[in-house]
Regions:
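Beta->alpha turn/N-cap motifs
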Residues: 58-62, 72, 77-86, 103, ...
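C-terminal segment of classical bacterial N-terminal signal peptides
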Residues: 14-23
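A bilobed periplasmic-binding-protein/Venus flytrap-type ligand-binding module shared by bacterial periplasmic
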Residues: 106-117, 219-231
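A conserved helix-loop-strand patch within extracytoplasmic ligand-binding domains
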Residues: 99-148, 247
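Short, polar/charged alpha-helical segment
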Residues: 33-58
Length: 268
């Protein structure tokens, strides 16, 4: 009986050590491939010099990285902007905070069918992200170009139900953000997040018919639970991601498609 108990404890220890959550000196960070995982890869060697084994787990959706960080499967994530996190925390009850602000990805409007938004036909099919904040963000961008009017042009949670004027009778199709680049041939235009535009070969500066201005509030952040956000390793990662060296890397690699916005946030 005692032998069985020892075996059971040993098995439990093995399972725990092999679990998805990181051990001391290791940070497991969930990230979308571009540009987030690429930026993390850039600081990986510097993190190792600080004694941190930075492990990057790639995701292609906007839900699982937050759930995994909240339940401890990840130490944190790097894929979302602050307004998205705020809404996610409210809607899903997760306990996540912003660790640092790293960069801004201007959202753009793309098309395989027209070269200018002036050529957008009556009744055109417009693809937008189906998550609340990015859907609202896309509608505010379209409103800024005069294509539609919305009830409150400052409300990041605006939905299609808040459209007050639609002179071109645009039809909106809400899809998962990651699917929008692949759906371009079936749409007249699509509003696409940069982290999904870049892997599809779309550059906001060269290919977008309309792009957000430099004053965008949608700063991309590293998020974690409060305890992990305050950890020495996470704070060291935040310093690396917000350094001038990383800002230089972002500027040179993405040529304005991604804009550095380095700032370490206060954890309460």
């Amino acid at each position: 009986m005692k032998k069985l108990s020892v075996l059971a404890l040993s098995a439990a220890a093995v399972l725990f050590s092999a679990s998805f959550a990181a051990n001391a000196g290791t940070l497991k960070i969930g990230a979308t491939p571009m540009p987030h995982a690429e930026i993390l890869e850039h600081v990986k060697a510097a993190a190792a010099e600080k004694g941190i084994d930075l492990q990057i787990i790639e995701f292609n959706d906007y839900v699982q990285p937050n759930l995994a960080a909240d339940d401890g499967e990840l130490d944190g994530n790097f894929f979302q902007h602050r307004p998205y996190l705020d809404v996610f925390v409210k809607d899903h009850g997760v306990n996540l905070v912003s660790v640092c602000s790293v960069h801004i990805e201007p959202m753009g409007v793309y098309s395989n069918k027209i070269k200018d938004l002036k050529d957008l036909k009556d009744g055109a099919l417009v693809g937008i992200p189906n998550d609340p904040t990015n859907g609202g963000r896309s509608l505010l961008l379209l409103a800024s170009a005069g294509l539609i009017k919305v009830a409150n042009p400052n409300d990041v949670t605006t939905t299609v139900l808040d459209i007050t004027e639609n002179p071109k009778n645009l039809e909106f199709r809400e899809l998962e953000a990651a699917q929008l680049p692949r759906a371009l041939d079936d749409l007249d235009v699509a509003v696409i997040n940069t982290n999904y535009a870049l892997p599809a070969g779309l550059n906001p500066n060269d290919d977008a018919l309309l792009i957000e201005g430099s004053e965008s509030p949608y700063v991309n952040i590293v998020a974690a639970t409060p305890d992990k956000a305050k950890s020495a390793d996470m704070q060291e990662l935040a310093k690396l991601l917000t350094s001038e060296e990383t800002a230089k890397f972002i500027r040179e690699k993405y040529q304005g498609a991604v804009v550095p916005a380095g700032q370490i946030d206060e954890i309460k």
